[in-house]
């Protein structure tokens, strides 16, 4: 905050670790034949799926969100796997935290459902735009990128917007970094300039600004050389200076 930055927490509402204290309340979790399960349709064996039919779990979740806003003075949440959580919970939770007086809360949904905006999120991930951007670099007509941009904008409510990116924590781990996806430094910068200046809110994922080539794994340490490619870092700084001064 002293640096003029907002701080938002990554909020994982859909599931918890298997050693979470909530595990003492089995009814708070999705169960099959009496056994708590991991999220259906995934291979996420390291987490347990929460049961949003349980009113006590919902109440505890909302209370925890309020704690981080009030006690820790967080500015909002980036809500992980938002598409996996029911609309009515997001509406209930967001209505509750927005009722806190004197707070301007930032709410980002890691998802693509349009009803996230109805629930109260200001930002949705621009997944379609990202997919089309990669397609253009793989040889498809660039005109399709503008059509995708327009479609995303038309499906976004007034006063709300999409997060635009050339990578994020999932893509950098499971797909590739921008240096690989967009054919080197010039391509990575060109793709990023599109996400910055074509509309929406740009996401800069740590290490892309110094042109890291290897993927960033989820479950192991991956030191980043922050001194690499200073000219690339300078280009990102220039882009963001223009973006922030020309809303």
PLM features: residue spans?
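Conserved protein kinase catalytic core
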Residues: 16, 20-21, 86, 116, ...
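Short glycine/proline-rich turn/loop motifs
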Residues: 41-52, 168-178, 220
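Conserved interdomain hinge at the start of the Helicase C-terminal
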Residues: 188-190
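A structural motif
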Residues: 74, 200-201
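Active-site-proximal helices and loops of the catalytic beta/alpha 8
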Residues: 63-66, 70, 75, 80-165, ...
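Substrate-binding/active-site clefts of carbohydrate-active enzymes
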Residues: 1-72, 92-102
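Hydrophobic beta-strand scaffold residues
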Residues: 4-7, 107, 202
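Short acidic/histidine-rich active-site segments
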Residues: 204-210
């Amino acid at each position: 905050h002293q640096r003029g930055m907002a701080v938002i927490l990554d909020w994982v509402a859909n599931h918890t670790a298997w050693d979470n204290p909530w595990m003492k309340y089995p009814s708070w979790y999705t169960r099959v034949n009496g056994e708590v399960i991991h999220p259906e349709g995934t291979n996420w064996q390291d987490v347990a799926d929460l049961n949003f039919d349980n009113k006590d779990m919902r109440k505890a979740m909302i209370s925890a969100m309020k704690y981080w806003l009030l006690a820790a003075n967080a500015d909002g949440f980036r809500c992980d796997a938002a598409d996996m959580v029911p609309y009515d919970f997001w509406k209930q939770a967001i209505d509750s935290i927005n009722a806190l007086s004197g707070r301007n809360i930032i709410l980002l949904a890691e998802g693509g459902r349009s009803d996230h905006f109805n629930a109260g999120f200001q930002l949705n991930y621009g997944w379609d735009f990202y997919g089309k951007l990669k397609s253009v670099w793989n040889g498809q007509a660039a005109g399709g990128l503008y059509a995708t941009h327009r479609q995303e904008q038309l499906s976004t409510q007034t006063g709300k917007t999409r997060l635009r990116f050339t990578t994020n924590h999932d893509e950098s781990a499971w797909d590739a970094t921008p240096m690989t996806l967009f054919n080197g430094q010039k391509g990575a910068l060109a793709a990023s300039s599109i996400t910055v200046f074509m509309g929406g809110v740009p996401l800069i994922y740590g290490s892309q600004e110094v042109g890291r080539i290897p993927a960033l794994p989820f479950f192991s340490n991956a030191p980043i050389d922050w001194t690499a490619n200073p000219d690339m870092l300078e280009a990102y700084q220039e882009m963001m200076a223009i973006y922030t001064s020309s809303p």
